[in-house]
């Protein structure tokens, strides 16, 4: 009986040794690390579309009164600020080559609900008034961002354009009498924009963002006909700031 027990123990030891040797080879340290760290998902990569709304503030308008068309450098300059709501929509594409790096392009179209009007300081009550009426605006921008989990901190910049109406109502009193002049310029003006934002991916395909943009438009001129052959010229230089929130859906 004891011999049978010894045989059983010996047989079990041999079998255990055999299966241990025949099992899978242990992973090296490097292989263990690689298997323990799966590749992080590219949460931000792909196309997206969304809406936005916010506020435009400190839209600074510098008006240069150049007097007659060929009078040379500006003789009087004044400024005024405007503000108002903005709303629109955006579409874009993100590429995420690294887990922490996001590169993208974005375009958006919106409306600037801003109106500004001011009288030239020092002019009589019925003197010179400058007015701006922005409307539809658009941007085409690049984006570069730092991603951490479902958060994205990014910088952005590119082209900015807006339908910008500028008006001058001028009443000049001189030795020849009272001269009334009106002029306007309603063009789609181009410039540049820079800014940044923070975006939060709160569900699989949905994200919320807060974004700031500074924009600067090229200078524009309004000619005001006076007398029969004379013209007053007024130069406009406009820039401003936009803060807006947005909601995006990523495909």
Short names for language-model regions:
Residues 2-251:
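Gram-negative outer-membrane beta-barrel domains
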């Amino acid at each position: 009986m004891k011999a049978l027990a010894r045989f059983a123990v010996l047989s079990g030891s041999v079998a255990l040794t055999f299966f241990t040797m025949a099992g899978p080879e242990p992973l090296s340290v490097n292989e263990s690390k690689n298997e323990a760290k799966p590749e992080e998902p590219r949460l931000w990569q792909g196309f997206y579309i969304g809406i936005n709304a916010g506020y435009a503030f400190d839209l600074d308008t510098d008006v240069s009164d150049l007097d007659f068309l060929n009078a040379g450098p500006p003789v009087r300059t004044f400024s005024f600020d405007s503000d108002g709501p903005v709303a629109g929509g955006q579409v874009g594409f993100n590429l995420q080559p690294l887990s922490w790096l996001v590169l993208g392009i974005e375009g958006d179209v919106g409306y600037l609900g801003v109106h500004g009007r001011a009288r030239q300081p020092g002019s009589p009550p019925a003197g010179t008034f400058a007015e701006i009426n922005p409307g539809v605006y658009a941007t085409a921008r690049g984006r570069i961002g730092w991603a951490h989990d479902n958060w994205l901190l990014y910088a952005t910049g590119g082209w900015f354009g807006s339908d910008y109406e500028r008006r001058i109502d001028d009443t000049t009193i001189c030795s020849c009498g009272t001269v009334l002049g009106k002029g306007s310029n309603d063009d789609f003006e181009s410039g540049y924009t820079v800014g940044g934002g923070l975006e939060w991916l709160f569900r699989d395909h949905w994200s919320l963002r807060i974004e700031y943009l500074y924009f600067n438009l090229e200078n524009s001129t309004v000619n005001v006909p006076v007398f029969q052959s004379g013209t007053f010229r007024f130069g406009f230089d406009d820039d401003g700031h936009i803060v807006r929130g947005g909601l995006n859906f990523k495909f």
